[in-house]
Regions:
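Acidic, Ser/Thr-interspersed intrinsically disordered low-complexity regions
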Residues: 4-8, 39-91
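Short acidic, low-complexity intrinsically disordered linear motifs used
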Residues: 676-679
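Consensus "Asn ladder" position of solenoid repeat domains
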Residues: 179, 237, 261, 291, ...
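Extracellular beta-strand-rich solenoid/capping regions of secreted or surface-exposed proteins
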Residues: 111, 115-119, 131-145, 154-232, ...
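PEST-like, low-complexity acidic/proline-rich intrinsically disordered segments
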Residues: 1-18
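All-beta strand scaffolds that present successive hydrophobic residues in beta-strands
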Residues: 143-145, 174-176, 202, 232-235, ...
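Short glycine/acidic-rich loop motifs that flank beta-strands on beta-rich extracellular proteins
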Residues: 131-135, 157-163, 184-192, 210-212, ...
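Acidic Gly/Asp/Thr-rich repetitive segments characteristic of extracellular carbohydrate-active
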Residues: 93-131
Length: 679
């Protein structure tokens, strides 16, 4: 018994280790098909890269029509399924004029057609490769597309954007569809001349416990180990001096729709030492749909970067970017929607959205106005990113619904100083935590409903920070995580209700020192170390109410070094020990049912004190209540029967013997045993 009582929360027996290893092996087998599919997909992408390189090889031979025709035919093989969905694009608008671009048409360059275009005109570009830096300034209601839906025109550029758009009004519209954009990078001398200064972009990153303060500039860029980035901090004027001068598509004012396009940064040929976005959006509205946005394995790229912009991204694939798939800096007037997209194989993060001024300031600015920040992340696959899958910082009104966060290198998703809803998502096999809810500077009041957290390498849900009052509610599966189902620490005070928490390798719920939680109406079972554990300074506000707590190979509830705590109306059964209290003070247990636990229903040890009122302690396979090591209990109106030993008091606790018999209903062969040779 001494050995048992001195066990800490960090002990686990050899059988649990074996079980953990078996589950890890099974998990690897189950993901084999997914990884195989990903490898096949990467092979297809390698072929796409080769196709992009062919464009460079024949750039100086662009007038050789035979080679050009063959090249464009090869390009059309890329992502065949996307083309099938969009080959019959039908834009029913009536246009006043149609401007055609090509060697056989009136306009030989795209820029010439743009310059001549009027509102309600459409520009159709014949198949071919156009090396231009197209500028659309002061135009509205213009459509730009390929002449042949089955043969995309290619706009090729380096040093400057393939296309830069600056309308007169935000309501002015430009539509772009069925075009391929290729950017080949930025020369260092061009970049320096742009006054793209260090101060406008900084990152603090950690790599293998070694910290760097990283500048996005030539001298320091070699230190950038983005593939293992743990944190990204963006200052207010990120990319301000750039103003979209270095990207594939730059949107600086207006409402721009990009549909059924392909944007590739895979064929960078210059020694680019800047971070290159595929799409840059500032103070504008961008709608990006059915578009493939490819990064580069060797150079620093971002899929989409937006600053103070409205962003709607739908059914896009954004992949292989070394600085993140989507990065967005928002204010109180912005709306960010990402739906039905695939964000895969990006380094640093799949998706990052943050407010610079903070959540409270955003809410204050939004008061009395119709404008309010909206973030909708719905039905996306955020998978295999070499970093965090999704990271939201200082945001409110976030709706994270129906996404899959799978096999990301760090955490599946992180919400820092946020509120909103996280509903019906899957967090599975991420190498860190499934979901991190953190309060650093402001409160976190996120509501976590009906999600699945399975086989994450750390915790299913990690909750931390002062004023973290998040709600964990109705999640049907928090299971198979290699540490804890739910981990509460660093002053957090969440509410955890109506969840199924089971088969986690450490604890179902762990509440550490200086934190507390309301744990109510959950089913918590078959967790390997304990079903619920809490203890340490300030954990005494923890309340465990109306739960079913069963089938743990160790303790149903384990409490150590806690002062206070309320455990009421729970069913605690089929555990090795129902409840263990070590060095605790003033624990209040009432109206609980303890039955069919293997060793003890309730153990008080190491000078613990507790009040037990109206509990039913029946049919446990050894001892009903064990009080030892100078512990003191106040027992009243408890029903104690049909245990092998109803009540056991160690030598230094015998003064409670008559008190227990008088105030409680103790029935059975052994009412009180003064000594026990087993412990």
């Amino acid at each position: 018994m001494e050995e048992k009582d001195n066990d800490s929360l960090n002990l686990i027996d050899s059988s649990s280790k074996k079980s953990q290893q078996d589950s890890i092996n099974n998990s690897q087998i189950k993901t084999k098909k997914k990884q195989k599919d990903l490898i096949l997909e990467e092979n297809d992408e390698e072929k796409d890269d080769e196709e992009d390189e062919k464009i460079n090889d024949i750039e100086n031979e662009i007038n050789e029509n035979e080679k050009l025709k063959d090249l464009m035919a090869d390009m059309n093989e890329e992502e065949e399924e996307e083309e099938d969905e969009n080959e019959n694009l039908n834009y029913d608008r009536h246009f006043d004029r149609e401007l055609k671009v090509g060697k056989d048409y009136e306009y030989k360059t795209i820029q010439a057609a743009i310059n001549d275009a009027k509102p309600n005109n459409i520009i159709k570009i014949s198949p071919g490769i156009y090396r231009e830096n197209v500028v659309i300034k002061g135009k509205t209601k213009i459509d730009i597309c390929s002449l042949d839906n089955n043969d995309q025109a290619v706009l090729l550029s380096d040093n400057s954007p393939c296309m830069m758009i600056y309308c007169l009004e935000q309501s002015d519209t430009i539509q772009i569809y069925n075009i391929k954009f290729i950017h080949r990078g930025i020369r260092e001398d061009i970049m320096k001349k742009s006054l793209f200064e260090i101060k406008f972009f900084s990152r603090y990153m950690t790599h293998n416990k070694e910290s760097y303060f990283i500048y996005q500039f030539a001298e320091e860029i070699e230190k950038l180990e983005i593939n293992y980035v743990l944190d990204i901090k963006i200052v207010e004027n990120i990319f301000e001096e750039n103003h979209g001068n270095f990207c594939a598509i730059s949107i600086l004012k207006g409402t721009v729709s990009i549909n059924n396009c392909k944007i590739s940064l895979a064929c960078i040929t210059t020694e680019t030492k800047s971070i290159l976005p595929a799409i840059y959006v500032e103070n504008s509205t961008a709608i990006v749909e059915n578009t493939l946005i490819k990064g580069n394995k060797d150079y620093l790229t971002i899929g989409i970067y937006s600053h103070d912009a409205q962003l709607k991204i739908n059914e896009c694939k954004i992949f292989r970017h070394k600085c993140g798939g989507i990065i967005s800096v928002v204010n109180e007037k912005n709306s960010i929607t990402v739906q039905k997209c695939r964000l895969v194989l990006n380094q640093g993060c799949g998706l990052l959205i943050m407010s610079i001024v903070g959540k409270s300031a955003l809410k204050e600015k939004a008061k009395g106005t119709k404008d309010t920040l909206e973030i909708n992340i719905e039905k996306n696959n955020i998978e295999f990113n070499e970093g965090c899958g999704m990271n939201l910082k200082k945001c409110f009104n976030a709706k994270i619904i129906g996404n899959i966060f799978l096999s990301n290198l760090l955490n599946g998703a992180e919400l820092t100083d946020c509120d909103g809803f996280v509903m019906m998502n899957v967090f599975e096999k991420n190498k860190g935590n499934g979901l991190v809810l953190e309060a650093i500077e402001e409160s976190n009041e996120a509501k976590i409903f009906k999600n699945k957290f399975d086989e994450n390498y750390k915790n299913g849900i990690d909750i931390s920070g002062d004023n973290n009052k998040c709600f964990i509610n109705q999640n049907d599966q928090i299971s198979g995580n290699y540490l804890n189902g739910i981990y509460v620490h660093n002053l957090a005070t969440p509410e955890i209700k109506f969840n199924n928490i089971y088969e986690n390798y450490h604890h179902g719920i762990l509440v550490e020192s200086k934190s507390s939680a309301l744990i109510e109406k959950n089913k918590i079972y078959e967790n390997i170390r304990t079903n619920i554990a809490f203890g340490g300074l300030l954990t005494g506000k923890t309340r465990i109410l109306e739960n079913e707590i069963y089938n743990s190979r160790n303790e149903g509830i384990y409490i150590v070094d806690a002062e206070g705590g309320e455990i009421g109306n729970n069913k605690i059964y089929n555990n090795n020990d129902g409840m263990v209290l070590i060095r605790c003070k003033d624990i209040f247990l009432y109206c609980n049912e303890f039955y069919k636990n293997m060793r003890t229903a309730i153990l008080l040890s190491d000078s613990s004190t507790a009040t037990l009122l109206k509990n039913e302690i029946c049919e446990n396979y050894f001892i009903g209540i064990l009080v030892r090591d100078g512990s003191q209990g106040r027992f009243k109106d408890n029903l104690i029967r049909q245990n092998v030993i109803q009540f056991y008091l160690s030598k230094n606790c015998l003064n409670q013997k008559n008190y227990v018999k008088k105030l409680n209903d103790v029935q059975g062969r052994y009412e009180v045993a003064d000594y026990c040779c087993v412990f």
